[in-house]
Amino acid sequence: MSKKNLQYFMRSTQQEVVTVPGPESFKDEEGKVIDFEIKVLSQAEIMKINDMYRTHRPTRDKKGNPLVMNNEIVWETERDSARASRHLIVEALQYPDLKDPDLMKHYNCVDITEMPLRVFPRADEYQFVTRIVMQALGLMSDENADNAEIEDAKN
């Protein structure tokens, strides 16, 4: 048996940046689709952002008293997954930088989680950007690859 070497698990800490074509509605002076740059976030960063939009509080009865079951307080957890996913988009997109103060001022926006909705106001643009970012982060599978696998399985 070969010697176990932990060197294989010592990965580079440099962040990976993926370049993908943006939506058809964003073109440069020459009419070419603008490329978006997406930083691949670590699982720890993704979990930290998701935890920011999770609230944990005691469940209350109709009188406003905490609900107790088996001598323990029953906790209620609420998640704002839409806002968390918009925050993930902002953190992952390097170009366009949605946290840029000039861009935020242009859209009269003070909350970074509102920027994806302002910069990509059309539903098709927003869905496209959400899909490419989530695929780059590994949170969503590539539909084309899935369809190809299904076609291969059929044949």
Please describe what each predicted stretch is:
Residues 1-14, 148-155:
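Low-complexity intrinsically disordered segments
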Residues 10-27:
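Short acidic, Pro/Gly- and aromatic-enriched capping/linker segments at domain boundaries
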Residues 30-155:
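Short, surface-exposed, charged amphipathic helix/loop patches that serve as local interaction elements
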